């Protein structure tokens, strides 16, 4: 695993934990927009974990998830990504996988590119969620990569 990819995954976990800390301190845990978008994020993370592990991605409809369930799923997802990443060497990172939700033409990407996609997809929607928190009167956190570096690469803390 490259050091940059490891850093992206570590930042990804920290930034998500910071988002949940901000959301958890707010009075808007029940906001349907936040719950729906955060549910989408973790569903995509779980789908990529399945694909990267050689399993089929789940496609069933789920009810709007609750805050506590979402936080638990995110934490589990990040633990799984960290475990997966520890076992990846150069050949594993270069292996091609097929992203099934883009069927025609087939979307083939390397494991490395899939991991970057997970981080960037989450970053995009996490930014939307932070903006939503602010619009609802909560206090979002600045989770820029540079801030994570400046703070000496802290680990994500999932406890409230």
Report the location of each language-model feature.
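Short, contiguous alpha-helical
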Residues: 6-62, 102-160
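Helix-adjacent hinge/juxtasegments
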Residues: 56-100
């Amino acid at each position: 695993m490259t050091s940059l990819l490891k850093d992206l995954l570590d930042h990804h976990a920290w930034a998500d934990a910071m988002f949940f800390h901000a959301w958890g301190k707010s009075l808007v845990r029940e906001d349907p927009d936040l719950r729906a978008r955060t549910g989408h994020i973790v569903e995509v993370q779980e789908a990529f974990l399945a694909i990267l592990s050689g399993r089929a991605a789940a496609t069933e409809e789920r009810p709007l998830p609750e805050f506590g369930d979402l936080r638990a799923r995110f934490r589990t997802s990040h633990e799984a990504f960290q475990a997966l990443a520890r076992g990846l060497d150069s050949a594993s990172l270069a292996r091609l996988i097929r992203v099934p939700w883009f069927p025609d033409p087939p979307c083939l990407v390397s494991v490395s590119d899939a991991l970057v996609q997970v981080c960037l997809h989450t970053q995009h929607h996490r930014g939307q969620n932070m903006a939503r928190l602010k619009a609802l009167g909560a206090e979002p956190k600045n989770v820029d990569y540079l801030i994570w570096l400046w703070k000496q690469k802290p680990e994500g803390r999932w406890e409230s």
